[in-house]
Amino acid sequence: MIDVVAAVIKKDNKYLIAQRNRDKHFAFHWEFPGGKVDKNETFENALKREILEELSIDIKIKNKIASEKYKDEKINVEVHYFLCKTLDLEIILSEHENMKWVLKKDLLNFTLAPGDSKIVKYL
């Protein structure tokens, strides 16, 4: 099983979701951005690194919200979700197709990656 971290970034009562790249597993699904934890890396350091790489922003991690396991024929992961806030104003996407700031009540109107839809209840 691979550990993955995801940032649930909240700003002005909206949450940031990003659309997965067309070449990735679950292409065009929406997700809370993040990525794989490297060997000997803490979840928090991995999350800060991934968000800087993918969105070009620095984040402040507030607390862990939940963990969800997902397995299919291609992947076997445990995703660790952290509530965060952005410390920057401008987001520059490097890996995603698109991004949106969405109210909690509207999150489930998007096709979310597995696991991400399950944690909406914790927000």
Predicted regions and their residues:
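A conserved beta-turn-beta hairpin within the catalytic core of GNAT-like acetyltransferases
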Residues: K24-F28
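Active-site-adjacent beta-strand/loop module that shapes the phosphate/pyrophosphate-binding cleft
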Residues: D3, D58, E68-E90, K100, ...
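Conserved N-terminal beta-strand and adjoining loop/helix that marks the start
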Residues: M1-L16, K36
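NUDIX/MutT-family hydrolases
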Residues: L83, I92-Y122
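Short, charged/polar surface micro-motifs in flexible loops or helix N-caps
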Residues: K10-K14, D23, D38, T86-L89
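Conserved hydrophobic "DFG−1" position in protein kinase catalytic cores
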Residues: I9-K10, I17, C84, W101
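Short coil/turn segments
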Residues: R20-R22, L112
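The catalytic Nudix box helix
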Residues: F32-K64, L103
